[in-house]
Amino acid sequence: STQAKTLFPYTTLFRSDSITVIEKNKDKAIIISCGSAISALHKVGIKPDIHVETERTKIVYDFLVNLNDPEYLRDVLFLSTDVIHPDCASLFNRSALAFKLSEPGAALYHNYFPHLNACAALGGVNPLVGNIGVSAPIHLGFKNLYLFGLDNGYKHKGHHHSKLSSYYNNEESAGALGEMMYGDSLWQREGNFGETIISNAMFDTSRWVIEQVLAANEDVSCFNCSDGVKIERAKAFPSADITLSIPVDKSALLGEIGTFCAPIPLSKKNFEPLLDIEFFNIFIDKMVAEWQQDFTSRNEINQLMLRNFGYLAQISATRQQHIAQVMIGSMNYVFTLLSSILYSFEDEEKTLVLMQPAIGLWLEFLEKAKEMYPQALDSVDMIDNEVMNLFRA
């Protein structure tokens, strides 16, 4: 697998000339579709060899079902991480999951079951599906990647994904989806083939993460055929210049990937006692008690946030580090908002009054977290996201 070429269609500006190149070389490379790119490939009758996803929400499953072609998906290899919506794998005959680095599942497995087979924990798979599209094949040993549609931005606001993808099932929906994704994005970045690309924080972070993955894997040759943002360590490469000549034995190669995989001989019962609900509640109760005070200065609030982060650092050094990983995202998010409010006005006394309802929401969240944590192993998103209606023709 180390010498195989990988054609990697992503979700954004997936042009018709790219489709022609992929069609021409589909027997000479492994095609990996990322997220909504599969809808563009489906529309022109090209089947990827591997499909990757990264989000844990039900809309990922609903999007795949919306292709309305179950047989198309059956013999595609599905690759993702342990946080993916569990229904996704039911659409494919073959699926393989790796742990997502820095998520609780990886910590629990590695801390409590070191006697079992070592399992991969993938980093660099966030924030967007294109990130796992780069990280996963590199981890599997692929050395030559060709990126299509990995734009991480756009030249023209009305054109943000392939015209063949489900984003453009109707014009009104395409506009609404574009507004959701980009809004008032004003970041300007250097383009892969020149010009300027408009990006935003999420897409720019995705670009940066890809650059870090490529920097850590200098033996990988990455060719960026996308008419989007420049990616360091990915050579700008017009798709028309791709000249692959050696056919790939896809069955053998995908079979080889299968040899890297094995079921984990554990069930929910093995993990339930490891959650340590008692310790989680002690941790939450301690923070609740500390936040239920009358603050007299900005500094008191700042110091309390730092102290709470200190608790996470201490927990991270123990076998309960999964608890720190459960809470770190929410604490980062809420404390960022609290810090922003804390310095919104010059008058300290008035600011502290404004902080009270914000702190109240934080306390509400902590109480809700205590309710939710015991059900962590059964918590699966079953919400029908109304955004799905925009993808339907």
Q: What annotation goes with each model-predicted range?
A:
Residues 2-12:
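Single conserved hydrophobic/aromatic residue that forms the stacking wall/gate
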Residues 22, 29-43:
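Histidine-anchored nucleotide/phosphate-binding helix
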Residues 35-39, 80-86, 226-230:
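Short, polar loop motifs at secondary-structure junctions
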Residues 37-38, 44-56, 140-161:
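Glycine-rich phosphate/pyrophosphate-binding loops
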Residues 42-140, 291, 295-298, 302-308, ...:
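Acidic/Gly/His-enriched mid-domain segments of enzyme catalytic cores or analogous surface patches
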Residues 52-74, 98-101, 162-182, 241-252:
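Acidic, Ser/Thr-rich peripheral helices and adjacent loops at domain boundaries
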Residues 127-130, 176-229:
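Polyanion-binding loop/helix "lid" in catalytic or ligand-binding cores
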